């Protein structure tokens, strides 16, 4: 088999059903009017609940700021009509920003060309995780590019259950500490009476 180079960018997919947004207890992660998902740094408490809620692993925690960070789809730029920095800087024109319908039409046409040449090409992002705002035209299977074949967005119920489990564990810890202190005070009183 012949070896070949395959390239792909990897950043936030701005999921239509964003697990990170659903998991954030302070609502620091929001969807803008243009559909991109951003972290409001002034509201983020650094709890990291969003990190395991992202099936793509593209959210990181900054020890320096104590908050999470991810691609904003160049929120400031797109709200000023400038497009994304990555699409402007891409030397091959492979990364594009624009109207979703136009981009899908271009991708579908290119996919048809690649398939006609016998390529194993596919579009990733139309159906994955209930649809992504960022999609890819891959020349091979998604896992070759480091993407999950069948990404699953954690259900809100699971995130809530995790939170309940954490709170229950904290409650048990506090109860054990109170019990220990009461027992310790009880033994001190016995020693004083003797």
Report residues per predicted region.
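Non-ligating segments of multi-cofactor redox enzymes
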Residues: 1-194
């Amino acid at each position: 088999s012949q070896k070949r180079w395959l390239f792909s960018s990897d950043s936030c997919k701005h999921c239509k059903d964003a697990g990170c947004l659903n998991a954030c207890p302070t609502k620091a992660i929001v969807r803008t009017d243009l559909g991109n998902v951003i972290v409001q740094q002034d509201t983020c408490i650094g709890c990291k609940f969003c990190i395991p809620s992202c099936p793509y692993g593209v959210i990181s925690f900054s020890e320096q700021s104590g908050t999470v960070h991810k691609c904003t789809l160049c929120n400031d730029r797109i709200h000023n009509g400038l497009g994304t920095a990555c699409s402007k800087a891409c030397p091959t024109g492979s990364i594009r920003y624009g109207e979703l319908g136009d981009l899908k039409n271009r991708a579908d046409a290119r996919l048809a060309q690649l398939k006609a040449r016998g390529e194993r090409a596919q579009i990733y992002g139309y159906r994955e995780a209930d649809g992504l705002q960022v999609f890819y035209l891959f020349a091979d299977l998604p896992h070759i590019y480091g993407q999950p074949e069948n990404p699953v967005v954690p259900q809100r119920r699971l995130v809530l259950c995790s939170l309940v489990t954490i709170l229950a564990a904290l409650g048990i810890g506090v109860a054990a500490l109170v019990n220990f202190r009461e027992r310790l005070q009880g033994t001190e009183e016995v020693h004083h009476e003797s």
